[in-house]
A protein has these predicted regions:
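An extracytoplasmic/periplasmic, membrane-proximal ligand-sensing/linker region
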Residues: 204, 210-211, 221-239, 291-346
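Bacterial N-terminal signal peptides
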Residues: 32-40
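Pocket-lining segment of extracytoplasmic ligand-binding domains
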Residues: 113-115, 123-128, 154, 191-283, ...
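N-terminal hydrophobic or amphipathic helices and topogenic motifs
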Residues: 38, 44-87, 133, 305-346
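Short, glycine-/small- and polar/acidic-enriched structural segments
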Residues: 49-163, 171, 239
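Bacterial N-terminal signal peptides that target proteins for export
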Residues: 3-7, 18-31
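Bilobed "Venus flytrap"/periplasmic-binding protein-like clamshell domains
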Residues: 52-78, 144-211, 305, 325, ...
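Ligand-binding clefts/hinges and TM-proximal coupling segments of bilobed small-molecule sensing domains
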Residues: 165-182, 255-324
Length: 346
C-alpha cells in the first residue's frame, strides 16, 4: 500500500556501496565511500518517507479521469509539505477499478455508488470474490445519470423499440455495462433480443452511431458528457428515456439508484430526460493511513475552485456535498476526522 520510492529503498544501502566500490578505481575507493557515507548521513529524512498513491479513474473521455487527475494535481501541489504524491491511472471503469483496489494494485478509486455497494457486500459481479469488508468511502462527488443515445432519424420511441438492436453498453468492467445488466433485468427480452449488444469503449462511439455501425449506445456518466457532445457534432441525436416504471423498479431494488432527470437544454433538448442516477464516489480501503486520506481531502478542498472547472458535472461541488456519501460502506477514519475538523460532521 505504501510505495516508498527512494534510491536507497530501491537498491539498499549495502548494494549501492558495493556498486560504488566496484565501479570506482581502487585508489579512489576510500574517498568515494567516505563521500557516499556523508551523502547518506545528510540526506533529508523526508525523502525516505514520501508516500506515493495511485488513483484508479476511468476512460479518458468521461468525468472520472479528469477528476482523478485534478485530485492528484491538487495533492502534488503541496507534496513538499505533507509528503504525499499522487498519480491518476486511466482504466476500464468502476468494476475494473474496484477489482484493482481489492487486489491492492491501486490505493484509491473513483467508482459508481452502485458497484461500490456490490463490491462491499460481495454481490452481483463480485459474488465470486466475497465481501470487500475493508472498503471505505472518502467522498461523494457528482451524480452520474444514464443516457441512451440514438440517431434522430432512428424512429425509436422508447426502450421497447431497442429490442434486437445493436446497442453498445460500454466495455466489460465499466459501470455502464454493469448498470445495463441491472436495467435489462426489467426488460422482457430473450437472449436472441440481446444478441446484437456490443461492449466497446467510448472512443469512436459518435462515428459508430452516425455511420450506422450501431443503433444506440448506453452510458452512465456525468453530464454534459463529452462523448454525447462529440456525437452531436457528427449527426443529430435523440434520447430514449428510461421511464418511470423501470426507474421505480430499480430504485425499489437498490437504494443506490434514484429517479433522475438530465436537465432540459443540456444537449439542446427542450424537455428534461427521464432516467436513473447514482453517485460517483472516491473510495479507498481501511488500511490506508488516515494521514493520506485527510491529505487528499484537504488538498481537494483547498483547490476546489480549480476542481469545479475540470468538468461541468463538478461545477457545484462543495465541502458539504463531499460528505454526502450514504452507502453501506462507512467513511474512512481519516475522512471522518477531516470532516469533523471542518465542521461538516457533528
Amino acid at each position: 500500500m505504501q510505495r516508498y520510492r527512494t534510491l536507497a529503498g530501491a537498491l539498499g544501502w549495502g548494494q549501492m556501496l558495493i556498486s560504488i566500490m566496484t565501479h570506482i578505481p581502487s585508489n579512489r575507493s576510500l574517498i568515494a565511500v567516505a563521500g557516499f557515507c556523508w551523502i547518506a548521513s545528510t540526506a533529508p529524512v523526508a525523502s525516505q518517507d514520501q508516500l506515493f498513491l495511485t488513483l484508479a479513474t476511468g476512460g479518458v473521455t468521461g468525468v472520472y479521469h479528469p477528476a482523478g487527475t485534478a485530485i492528484c494535481r491538487a495533492v502534488n501541489k503541496s507534496r513538499s509539505e505533507h509528503g504525499v504524491r499522487c498519480a491518476a491511472e486511466a482504466g476500464s471503469g468502476s468494476v475494473g477499478s474496484l477489482k484493482q483496489l481489492r487486489d491492492r494494485d491501486v490505493d484509491f478509486a473513483i467508482v459508481q455508488a452502485d458497484w461500490q455497494h456490490h463490491a462491499y457486500l460481495g454481490t452481483s459481479v463480485f459474488a465470486e470474490f466475497g465481501p470487500m469488508a475493508d472498503l471505505k468511502v472518502v467522498a461523494g462527488l457528482h451524480t452520474e445519470m444514464a443516457a441512451i443515445v440514438a440517431r434522430a432519424d432512428s424512429g425509436f420511441m422508447d426502450l421497447s423499440d431497442l429490442k434486437g438492436q445493436r446497442i453498445n453498453i460500454g466495455p466489460a468492467g465499466s459501470g455502464s455495462a454493469a448498470t445495463w445488466g441491472q436495467l435489462s433485468q426489467h426488460l422482457p427480452w430473450s437472449e436472441e433480443d440481446r444478441a446484437a449488444i456490443t461492449q466497446e469503449d467510448l472512443s469512436g462511439l459518435g462515428e459508430a452511431l452516425c455511420s450506422g455501425e450501431i443503433d444506440a449506445y448506453f452510458v452512465v456518466i456525468g453530464h454534459p458528457a463529452g462523448v454525447i457532445e462529440e456525437t452531436q457534432e457528427v449527426c443529430p441525436v435523440q434520447f430514449i428515456e428510461i421511464g418511470a416504471g423501470i426507474s421505480e423498479k430499480m430504485v425499489a431494488d437498490a437504494p443506490y439508484y434514484r429517479a433522475a432527470e438530465i436537465p432540459s437544454g443540456t444537449y439542446g433538448e427542450h424537455n428534461a430526460i427521464e432516467t436513473i442516477g447514482t453517485r460517483a464516489l472516491l473510495i479507498t480501503v481501511e488500511q490506508m493511513p488516515a494521514h493520506a486520506v485527510s491529505t487528499v481531502l484537504r488538498s481537494l478542498l483547498s483547490d476546489i475552485e480549480r476542481f469545479r472547472t475540470v468538468h461541468p458535472a463538478l461545477t457545484d461541488l462543495d465541502g458539504a456535498q463531499l460528505v454526502e456519501a450514504k452507502t453501506e460502506a462507512p467513511l474512512h477514519l481519516g475522512a471522518v476526522q477531516f470532516y469533523e475538523d471542518q465542521g461538516y460532521l457533528p
